[in-house]
């Protein structure tokens, strides 16, 4: 029964391929100009990269290195002591 269901779902998934138009149908709402889309993505990515490098080198986002270390207690009490854990 499981094999029949799987085969039926595969046939249903493949049915739209039979009615699909070729990729040259420029009037289709699902036609994309992939070259322009890729070029726009590369330009956008390059601008983001340049902006990130400029922000990192500008010194506006400084990590403050002169923090005073937090005072920790000298002796830390363990949460689980030997023999306190039950199995």
From Swiss-Prot:
Selectively present in the distal parts of the nephron (medullary and papillary collecting ducts and end portions of cortical collecting tubule) and in the epithelial cells of the distal colon. No expression is found in renal proximal tubule, loop of henle and distal tubule, proximal colon, small intestine, lung, choroid plexus, salivary glands, or brain. Its main location: membrane. One of its GO terms (cellular component) is basolateral plasma membrane. GO terms for biological process: inorganic cation transmembrane transport; positive regulation of sodium ion export across plasma membrane; sodium ion transport. It holds the Pfam family ATP1G1_PLM_MAT8. Residues 58-87 are cytoplasmic. InterPro entries: FXYD4 (IPR047283), FXYD_motif (IPR047297), Ion-transport_regulator_FXYD (IPR000272). Residues 21-35 are extracellular. The chain crosses the membrane at residues 36-57. It is found in: Cell membrane; Basolateral cell membrane. Induction: By corticosteroids. Residues 1-20 form the signal peptide. Regulatory subunit of the sodium/potassium-transporting ATPase which is composed of a catalytic alpha subunit, a non-catalytic beta subunit and a regulatory subunit. The regulatory subunit, a member of the FXYD protein family, modulates the enzymatic activity in a tissue- and isoform-specific way by changing affinities of the Na+/K+-ATPase toward Na(+), K(+) or ATP. Associates with and regulates the activity of the sodium/potassium-transporting ATPase (NKA) which catalyzes the hydrolysis of ATP coupled with the exchange of Na(+) and K(+) ions across the plasma membrane. Increases the apparent affinity of the transporter for Na(+) and increases NKA activity. This is FXYD domain-containing ion transport regulator 4.
């Amino acid at each position: 029964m499981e094999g029949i269901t799987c085969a039926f779902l595969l046939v249903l998934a493949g049915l739209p391929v039979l009615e699909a138009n070729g990729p040259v149908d420029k009037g289709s709402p699902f036609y994309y100009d992939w070259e322009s889309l890729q070029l726009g993505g590369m330009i956008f990515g390059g601008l983001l990269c340049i902006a990130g490098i400029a922000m990192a080198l500008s010194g506006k986002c400084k990590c403050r290195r002169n923090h005073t270390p937090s005072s920790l207690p000298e002796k830390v009490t363990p949460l689980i002591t030997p023999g306190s854990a039950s199995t």
